[in-house]
Amino acid sequence: MAYYTPRELDLKVMKGFLCFPFLFLLLVAGPAWGAPVPEVGFLEPEPGFSELGAVADPMDLPKLERAALLASGLRPEELDPYQSRLDRIIVEAGAAAEQGPDATAKAESVLTFLHKNVLRSYREDATTIDGILDTGLYNCVSSAVLYMLAVRGIGIDVAGVRTSDHAFCTVLVGGRSVDVETTNPYGFDPGGKKEFKDSFGRLTGYAYVAPGGYGDRRAIGERELVGLILSNRASVLELSGRFAEATRLGADYAALCPGADSRAFQVDRINNLVASLEARRDFDGAVAAARAASAALPGEARLSALARTAAYNQAVALSQAGDWDAAFQAAARLAAASPEDAASAALVAGSLSGLAQSYGRKGDFAGARGAIAERADRAGPAAVAEARSVVGEMELVGAANGLPLAEAVAAADRILADGEISPARYAQAIEAIYGKEASRIGAGGDWLAAAAIADRGIAKLGVARLGGTDGSGDGSLARLAQTLRRNFVADAHNRFARFYNSGDYSGAKAALTSALASMPGDPTLTRDLAAAEAALSN
């Protein structure tokens, strides 16, 4: 007859701390790295932009020149020599235009003059006016701004046009609006010019948008055209990871060109700065930048949301680093500011549970409960209940797997009475505690003593049911007791067989009589006893 191996029950941890995901901040453009965030001044425009932004349209030509040079990155004290050079170009372009018979010819001659004498070579990132003056390198934005200034100098109405990837000018001459693709010497009224069509795309890499293609072109004023210098410079800075500097340009743009578009551009730059700081795991810097921006631009909903997201991610980072108290404090501030925010509430509960676990891992369950109690007012009832269940679970597992039987049962009873575990979990613990002890005794061969321990566990669960607690267990203790008794019967049968097979029928009968005294009525032992007695009677 074979033995049935008893199943040793082991109580495992069922509940662990939740892993909270970061709320990702999407970069509008550019890689996620850069220089450290400066002081709050990154939200302030450079001197001169606010003053120019307050000037009504149209600006006079000197102010427009000043705006273009400031947007190009020159400091106020650097402007005079560049403005003098710019004035000279405007005067010379005007002199060349005087030879034209009408406004159309004059406007075209200005473009011809600039390409012959100033604009040397196209380069995509050559977006500043001082860059043109110093090197002759230009792109669509800088050449359009220079043309705008020069044609304004001869009194012709001019405006800007922007598309998704390009900028140019229009002039009002001869009673009609004429496109001027300033990157190309043949760019005046370019639609029918073969020379323009052959060279434009090859030179710039962009597609010309004809006047009828209004879905991808938008008229902008002179001020907005100058603002594109700032926009381009910011994009270049972000591509090299210099997000704080790009954010300063966003402030300049918003000051120079007040309105929804420039404000959206500024907020995008702030978003990218915060996202880049988070990508470098500088969560303190990200929170500081987002909060400073939200305070400096009150009423901007995107910035309020950005500040909340940055603070949430800071709390998540603290929890991931195991700084549970700091994580809880940060999460509690968030939850207090946004009581209906489920993510913040979950983070409060998770960080409090994590703090409790940090005590529990050291076996300091009293300290864990004390830490929970100290923070109960800020955490709220749900978070407290969750954290206490974590502590109860940890203590229960430790007791079930490490304490003697009586102490382990007492701990389980207390944890259940404190409401830190459910009746079903209590039943699992009782089964594990009694099952482990029964298996330990059974391993020494005392099968019936082991079965008696299992029976005590079954009785314990029965008392729990009678007391109104639904903790009936899964029947594993009953199965274990049955296995242990089967092993007792197997042992007794094998002893009987040894006596019987050696012809010692008296010894066989004595062994069975003793076994039946412990398990009266067992059918296997009863049959064996009958066989021994039959052999003795022959």
Question: What is each of the regions a protein language model found here?
Answer:
Residues 2-5, 469:
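Ala/Thr-enriched low-complexity intrinsically disordered regions
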Residues 7-21:
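Bacterial N-terminal signal peptides that target proteins for export
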Residues 19-29:
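Bacterial N-terminal signal peptides
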Residues 34-374, 385-397, 401-410, 417-439, ...:
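A structural boundary/capping signal
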Residues 458-461:
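Long, intrinsically disordered low-complexity tandem-repeat regions enriched in serine/threonine/proline
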